[in-house]
Amino acid sequence: EILQKANSYNFTSDLAEKHSLDEEYSVWNLVELLPVGKFVELYTMYYQEYKSSNYSDYLQSNKFLRNAAAHSNCLMSSIMKPKGAKKFRKTIKLTNALSQAQKEISLHARSKYMAYPTFHDFVALLFVYNDLLKEAANRNMRDKTMDELYHFFCEKDGRVLKYKEYFEKNQVIAEAYRFISGVIQYIKKQNNNPKHKRYLKI
């Protein structure tokens, strides 16, 4: 794959050409050149070989949303009619982690929305992000991002609620909003809890 990149024009072709001539190069050189899907494969392979705590169970979900965003896919068009739903299998560990949000999200809502890939993968993305950035050195950046997301979704002058009258009568969108809003409120509460350690079991 590095040779292929080196022989074709793209934004990493110069870097690929440089490393294609190296007899040995470091794994982080490889990471610089790999597309997201190949990075996930490399990450999973590494932790299959070297057993330790990792996020392999959740990275496919993160990859799905990253690719959808990168290609400007319209996720709204398929939130209740998930593409590839027959192949979709929700992550039990993720569902169990969300079960801690009993005050914010009802059991019915958790069961319903975690069965849809888009919602399932968005929850996975939020939990992985907040777990990875929980250390003191990254916490300010994490909290800033989550404050922006909370404002966007949950506050009256945020983008989502600013024109809520457009969607109030659409039960599909309104119920989906309440689920996502509940997830974000739960994360904000837990991030402010000094006893909270992590969202996911890894």
Where are these predicted regions, by residue range?
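Short, contiguous, well-structured surface segments enriched in hydrophobic/aromatic residues
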Residues: E1-N54, M76-S77, D131-R139
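Homeobox/homeodomain signature
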Residues: L21, L65-R66
